Amino acid sequence: MIASFYAFLDYLKNMKAASPHTLRNYSIDLSSLKCFLEKKGELTPTPPLSLQEDSRSSSQLSFSLFTKENIRLYLLEQIQTTHSKRTVRRRLSAIKSFAKFCVKNQWIPENPAEMIRGPRLPKELPSPLTYEQVLALMSAPDLDKVTGFRDRCLLELFYSSGLRISEITALNRSDIDFQSNLLRICGKGKKERIVPMTKVAVQWLQAYLDHPDRAAVEQDHQACFLNRFGKRLSTRSIDRKFQQYLLKTGLSGTITPHTIRHTIATHWLERGMDLKTIQLLLGHTSLETTTIYTHVSMKLKKQIHDEAHPHNLED
């Protein structure tokens, strides 16, 4: 069975063009399942699944343990060990995709996870930042350092073009058209789209790329954004710096780089941009995904209405 895990990860990488972030999540989720099944079958534990071909281990794990009952027990254990409902749902989704792949390859007769439902999540709308909060966040990086210059540029691009964090890290210098103020973005499934940049974002991007301290450490000559060692910046590094800036500005709540993507989409809608254009800019495959911002916009309008209405101001 261990070989099927690796075949699935290779399939995601080579055939589905999954991002490194997605591959890492699948590897973590399936490693967790593997560990549970090994324990259930009283087998010798093996290392987590590796994305590196030269460090992959073998196991005596059999498909006979990959049953509906064991999957249910695994999910129950996940819930009881304080994993969030969102994480458990993600892991179930990974298991279903893996099982479907195994059925397609005729390794198992049917998908044991097909009819299993994950824990329900409360319906949550993304909470966008205000324009003032966006400005506060952008002012947080220390511009005396090239890394601060880089981070200001990152924040400008997040808000300018509504990019995903994986799209930012994958950005190459050759993807930038300074004459037209456009970016060529490689999105999910390696689907390309062209997005515009604001003049402010262009100025910060040009200034960062021309920064002498950036040139002094540059090792990856293709990557747009570099870490302090001159190599391509990772999504983890961006997440870590982002959390530091949230603390510095005093912003609270569940705020991530993806929040800025939600924020600019909401701001575009509130300023009259049509949903189809927002869909194209964000790289959504389905317009249905984009319509969530109409609910966010209405929620904000209702909040403003309730706070400003004279009847609500009475004692």
UniProtKB/Swiss-Prot annotation:
UniProt keyword annotations, A-Z: Cell cycle, Cell division, Chromosome partition, Cytoplasm, DNA integration, DNA recombination, DNA-binding
Domain Core-binding (CB): 1-103
SUPFAM superfamilies: DNA breaking-rejoining enzymes (SSF56349)
InterPro entries in the record: CB (IPR044068), DNA_brk_join_enz (IPR011010), Integrase-like_cat_sf (IPR013762), Integrase_catalytic (IPR002104), Integrase_recombinase_N (IPR010998), Integrase_SAM-like_N (IPR004107), Recomb_XerC (IPR011931), Tyrosine_recombinase_XerC/XerD (IPR023009)
Example of a GO biological process term: cell division
Subcellular location: Cytoplasm
GO molecular function: DNA binding; tyrosine-based site-specific recombinase activity
Coiled coil (residue ranges): none
UniProt KW Kinase keyword: no
Main location class: cytoplasm
Active site (catalytic residues): 164, 188, 258, 261, 284, 293 (o-(3'-phospho-dna)-tyrosine intermediate)
Entry's Gene Ontology cellular component terms: cytoplasm
The Tyr recombinase domain, residue ranges: 124-306
Similarity field: Belongs to the 'phage' integrase family. XerC subfamily.
Function: Site-specific tyrosine recombinase, which acts by catalyzing the cutting and rejoining of the recombining DNA molecules. The XerC-XerD complex is essential to convert dimers of the bacterial chromosome into monomers to permit their segregation at cell division. It also contributes to the segregational stability of plasmids.
Subunit structure: Forms a cyclic heterotetrameric complex composed of two molecules of XerC and two molecules of XerD.
The protein's name: Tyrosine recombinase XerC
